[in-house]
Amino acid sequence: MAKPIPKVGSRRNGRSSARKSARRIPKGVIHVQASFNNTIVTVTDVRGRVISWSSAGTCGFKGTRRGTPFAAQTAAGNAIRAVVDQGMQRAEVMIKGPGLGRDAALRAIRRSGILLSFVRDVTPMPHNGCRPPKKRRV
């Protein structure tokens, strides 16, 4: 009979050691994507690796409430709370999209105590690219 291969660490108990320990991140980039339906806040380090993220949907808002300014404020607060614990003091903010949550997310970021080096609007603007969808008739 073949000898069983000894398990070094199963998936269940080896999970905690596989997770990276929280490293100190003094400076980062906060990306806010505000669409009409949702607001997504992603916090990365300066190299672009994601540290934390949150959206209005993951904060418990469903349906049309995801696009509200209050939902964006809650999502920004959740994403930033994790990185403040890791020692982030300075950040750059990139805001993308036309949604209602742009200003509310920025206000929540300002209130968190992180110093903002700059705020940049990176909304993609077409130079007469694709034809836009037809206007809604309600």
Curated annotation (Swiss-Prot):
Entry keyword set: Chloroplast, Plastid, Ribonucleoprotein, Ribosomal protein, RNA-binding, rRNA-binding
Highest taxon, organism lineage: Eukaryota
Record-level Gene Ontology MF annotations: rRNA binding; structural constituent of ribosome
Record's subcellular location: Plastid, Chloroplast
Gene3D superfamilies per UniProt: Ribosomal protein S11
Claim: Kinase is one of the keywords in the record: no
Region listing for Disordered, in residue ranges: 1-24
Listed Basic residues bias regions: 9-24
GO cellular component annotations of the record: chloroplast; ribonucleoprotein complex; ribosome
Family membership noted in the UniProt record: Belongs to the universal ribosomal protein uS11 family.
UniProt name for this protein: Small ribosomal subunit protein uS11c
UniProt organism field: Gossypium hirsutum (Upland cotton)
